[in-house]
């Protein structure tokens, strides 16, 4: 008896997930494989994916357009949280995984599957994100991860697939592993595994090389409503359209590249190249608007929560109780975060140069050093005495010892 009768497989069209189809059937005795591809803005690569899955042995191939859900339910909360992993990575790839896990569970329940499957290896982050997400959404579903168990090298995997007519898109001249969605691209493997090797320019698609960027700066006004981006240069835009247009605008100026060594969930370090032009600029602009509309103590407390939020996303805990509790806090903080932020784009740099809000708690009359100054300077002496009293008492008791 096989490990499962009917399986829903997360399918990308790449060699690993394509090989999973015959492997599940031939090696693990699965009777029926249904593939599911989530359209998260990958572009043309989804075109032939259904035909390829059926050719590899799937009984049905599903493509779910989840771009709007991806932006509204996953990207926007992350922007409200200013979520960055290790203070740099805006989680453009990681954010897609809990949504794909949700779609897998929904498809399994709809089609009566007794298991779901993915093509993640045993040393990556995605296996954790998928498995934990699926467990949280439907604990009764089995999760099959053939690539984690089959023990084949990359070359052996390609050779196995060739027996079933599966061609590999990975060539010696382009040995990179690439993941793409509307929020960005991640590139790894090949020569990038040497941390001293400069990434070749041809791996970048969303961002221009500095030499090819415009010679004049460009400004963009980003409008927010309760922490959610809603407009560009005064024009209200649908969520997917806003991200897409901002990607093009920001990437044109060479903004949005990351080259970093990160700590994976499984305990190893990896070298990752990311392109996430819109997401990086939106987080920067949103954080700046918060500085105008939130009190200092809320801002400072939220910064610590933001780091935890990024960790939860990266480590596959999107559906955890802690994440849900933090969401409630963040939503409360965003009630006043409405306004616009002006960003200057030029030669690989995105710089906030202006911000405004009807909820601004910045008072020019209190901040100015000019004649309009309304700050009560005399009150400072009493404040300083009370503020410094613990230090004064401590010094009196300890300095003489």
Swiss-Prot record:
Enzyme class: ligase
Residues annotated as binding ATP: 10-18, 38, 119
Endpoints of the signal sequence: none
Subcellular location per the Swiss-Prot or TrEMBL entry: Cytoplasm
Keyword Amino-acid biosynthesis part of the UniProt annotation: yes
Keywords: Amino-acid biosynthesis, Arginine biosynthesis, ATP-binding, Cytoplasm, Ligase, Nucleotide-binding
Swiss-Prot/TrEMBL catalytic activity: L-citrulline + L-aspartate + ATP = 2-(N(omega)-L-arginino)succinate + AMP + diphosphate + H(+)
EC number of the protein: 6.3.4.5
This protein's GO CC annotations: cytoplasm
Classification via Pfam families: Arginosuc_syn_C, Arginosuc_synth
PROSITE patterns assigned to the protein according to its UniProt record, in alphabetical order: ARGININOSUCCIN_SYN_1 (PS00564), ARGININOSUCCIN_SYN_2 (PS00565)
Domain of life the protein comes from: Bacteria
Binding annotation for L-aspartate: 121, 125-126
Associated pathway: Amino-acid biosynthesis; L-arginine biosynthesis; L-arginine from L-ornithine and carbamoyl phosphate: step 2/3
Assembly information from the UniProt record: Homotetramer.
Family: Belongs to the argininosuccinate synthase family. Type 1 subfamily.
Listed name of the protein: Argininosuccinate synthase
